[in-house]
Swiss-Prot record:
Keywords: Ribonucleoprotein, Ribosomal protein
Lineage: Archaea, Thermoproteota, Thermoprotei, Desulfurococcales, Desulfurococcaceae
InterPro entries noted in UniProt: Ribosomal_eL33, Ribosomal_eL33_sf, Transl_B-barrel_sf
Protein name from the UniProt record: Large ribosomal subunit protein eL33
Family: Belongs to the eukaryotic ribosomal protein eL33 family.
One annotated GO molecular function: structural constituent of ribosome
Single GO biological process annotation from the record: translation
Cellular component, GO, one term: ribosome
Length: 94
């Protein structure tokens, strides 16, 4: 199973709306264009109290740069911004 680490950039936002259940995560990859391989993968965030937040990678955010949209349930707290996320690629060996 391929794993990648990422950094939480913040919530997905519109002009007047914020979507706290959707987090933008920048994957720390050698080639940012490979971020698409992690779509439908599972993401984990652990806070300093030991709580684990689990989410699914929904789609890419932008054309390049390695940013993906992850839907967490329950939503990430605001303090997670800048925190580290572990992403596991879905599927087989790939």
């Amino acid at each position: 199973m391929a794993r990648a680490r990422g950094v939480v950039l913040g919530y997905r936002r519109g002009t007047n709306t914020q979507y706290p259940q959707h987090a933008l995560v920048k994957l720390l990859l050698d080639d940012p264009r490979k971020a698409g391989l992690y779509v439908s993968g599972i993401a984990f965030y652990r806070d300093r109290y030991g709580n684990v937040y689990k989410g699914r990678v929904l789609r890419l955010h932008g054309r390049r740069g390695g940013v993906v949209v992850v839907k967490f349930n329950p939503p990430l707290p605001g303090q997670a911004t800048g925190g580290v996320v572990e992403v596991v690629k879905a599927g087989g060996d790939g």
